[in-house]
């Protein structure tokens, strides 16, 4: 296909493909290119809703913002959202098309998936100067290569000069590079135009003998040695939550997020982590809840299964007791549903059909349906401060109904749309369907100020920018750092 492109693959998962791809998008955008990110197939529970209501991986949305363009579904034509029991929801060009187990996925979706990839690339070619493609995992998985929709099949289709990224932080980098190249077909290996050594810590001169050997051994230049930057870049995989730092020396507030097994859109909490006076801690449902300033139940792809786990581990009771003692609890999306009175799944969308009792902290009843809601929203807040503009997006299959209350003032709509969330009269129990809630700077600060007041702390200014401005600065910083250590000359026409 005649389209200018760069492919980024990695020797392993977590090599840093997303970071490098994102940085290249911003670097080339700053040089005047009209760039589109692309990932043929992504498996992730962090999703974003485009303007036309389609779902893509959140990482591709970040890459689009890095490129200075609006996210499109064509930038991630296949999104797989794991649901447990070795099954995933399959989303093609933004729309859910089915649920399938791993064994049957390629049998049912390989051909339509590749057509969606081809059509998406052809569409992007009409609108952009260059596409930056990101692979997944490793391009040299022998048992998967014949049905790989994401790595070298895309590179060959585009005849794309390809970067091979390796993580040196965990050790074994040289073996990973040589082994990967040995396992590629000659046609694939010919496309590898440079190696990037990522996550390097230490003195560069100590690495030079290894680089010299690698270049002589493979005949491929090392075009970049990138310092360790992962701490300033949002993680895509929930496993990375285990490695996040939870301690801040000067944190005034401690917020605990329950790390549900199928936690989704934990990017919702990046803005909280960016607050200098807030420490965010992720705990498993089996850990002690402790006494934080607030507890958050995040989104989840398997609401009922995670609700049952919370009940089995005692975390559900711990949260109920915490709320009864005056603690602040917030549920987002699936977490909001869990805080309600009941969740019903009559069609067995999430697994076994049935009705399940929630934590009964909010007066809502939820029914899981086959029709997913995915849309961007612009609303106005009622709490914690009246009239604040709030932007975000919904992604959920449940329909929640607010139950009538004897005391009409006991619970109030959180926004000017009652269907988007509730808060109790004490402003202790909150629930919302809105992802990206904390991205809204004034709303985030107003919510945090309520927690600060409970601690007797001075309120912080609420006239702050939305998180997207911090994200833009982060993307600029990452791009500048990568550009200082990466030679893109062999990859540009």
From Swiss-Prot:
Record-linked HAMAP family: CobQ
Gene3D superfamilies: 3.40.50.880, P-loop containing nucleotide triphosphate hydrolases
Alphabetized Pfam families for the sequence: CbiA, GATase_3
Protein's name according to its UniProt entry: Cobyric acid synthase
Task of the protein: Catalyzes amidations at positions B, D, E, and G on adenosylcobyrinic A,C-diamide. NH(2) groups are provided by glutamine, and one molecule of ATP is hydrogenolyzed for each amidation.
Gene Ontology biological-process annotations: cobalamin biosynthetic process
Native source organism of the sequence: Nostoc sp. (strain PCC 7120 / SAG 25.82 / UTEX 2576)
Organism ancestry: Bacteria, Bacillati, Cyanobacteriota, Cyanophyceae, Nostocales
Gene (name only): cobQ
Superkingdom classification of source: Bacteria
Occurrences of domain GATase cobBQ-type (ranges): 252-443
Listed transmembrane segments: none
Active site: 333, 435
């Amino acid at each position: 296909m005649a389209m200018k492109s760069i492919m980024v693959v990695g020797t392993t998962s977590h090599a840093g493909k997303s970071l490098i791809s994102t940085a290249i998008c911003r670097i080339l955008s700053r040089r005047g290119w009209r760039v589109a990110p692309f990932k043929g197939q992504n498996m992730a529970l962090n999703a974003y809703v485009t303007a036309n209501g389609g779902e893509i991986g959140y990482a591709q949305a970040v890459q689009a913002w890095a490129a200075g363009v609006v996210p499109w579904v064509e930038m991630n034509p296949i999104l797989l959202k794991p649901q447990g029991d070795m099954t995933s929801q399959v989303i093609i060009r933004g729309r859910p098309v089915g649920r399938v187990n791993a064994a049957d996925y390629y049998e049912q979706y390989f051909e339509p998936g590749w057509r969606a990839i081809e059509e998406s690339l052809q569409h992007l070619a009409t609108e952009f100067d260059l596409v930056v493609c990101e692979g997944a995992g490793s391009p040299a998985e022998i048992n998967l290569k014949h049905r790989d929709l994401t790595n070298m099949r895309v590179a060959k289709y585009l005849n794309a000069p390809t970067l091979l990224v390796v993580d040196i932080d965990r050790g074994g980098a040289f073996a990973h590079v040589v082994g990967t190249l040995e396992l590629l077909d000659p046609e694939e290996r010919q496309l590898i135009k440079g190696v990037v050594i990522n996550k390097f810590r230490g003195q560069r001169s100590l690495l030079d003998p290894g680089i010299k050997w690698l270049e002589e051994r493979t005949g491929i230049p090392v075009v970049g040695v990138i310092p360790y930057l992962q701490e300033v870049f949002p993680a895509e995989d929930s496993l990375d939550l285990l490695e996040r730092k939870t301690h801040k020396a000067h944190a005034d507030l401690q917020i605990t997020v329950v790390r549900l097994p199928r936690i989704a859109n934990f990017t919702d909490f990046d803005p909280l982590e960016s607050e200098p006076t807030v420490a965010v801690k992720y705990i498993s449902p089996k850990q002690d809840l402790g006494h934080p300033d607030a507890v958050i139940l995040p989104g989840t792809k398997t609401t009922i299964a995670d609700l049952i786990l919370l009940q089995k581990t005692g975390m559900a009771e711990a949260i109920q007791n915490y709320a009864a003692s005056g603690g602040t609890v917030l549920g987002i999306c699936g977490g909001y549903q869990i805080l309600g009175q009941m969740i019903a799944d009559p069609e067995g969308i999430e697994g076994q059909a049935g009705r399940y009792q929630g934590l009964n902290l909010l007066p809502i009843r939820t029914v899981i349906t086959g029709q997913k809601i995915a849309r961007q929203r612009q609303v106005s807040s009622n709490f914690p401060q009246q009239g604040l503009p709030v932007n975000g997006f919904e992604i959920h299959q449940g329909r929640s109904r607010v139950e009538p209350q004897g005391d009409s003032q006991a619970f109030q709509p959180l926004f000017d749309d009652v269907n988007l969330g509730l808060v109790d009269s004490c402003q202790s129990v909150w629930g919302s369907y809105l992802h990206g809630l904390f991205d809204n700077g004034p709303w985030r600060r107003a919510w945090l100020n309520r927690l600060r007041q409970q601690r007797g702390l001075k309120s912080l200014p609420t006239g702050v920018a939305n998180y997207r401005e911090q994200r833009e600065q982060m993307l600029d910083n990452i791009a500048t750092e990568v550009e200082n250590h990466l030679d893109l000359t062999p990859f540009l026409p």
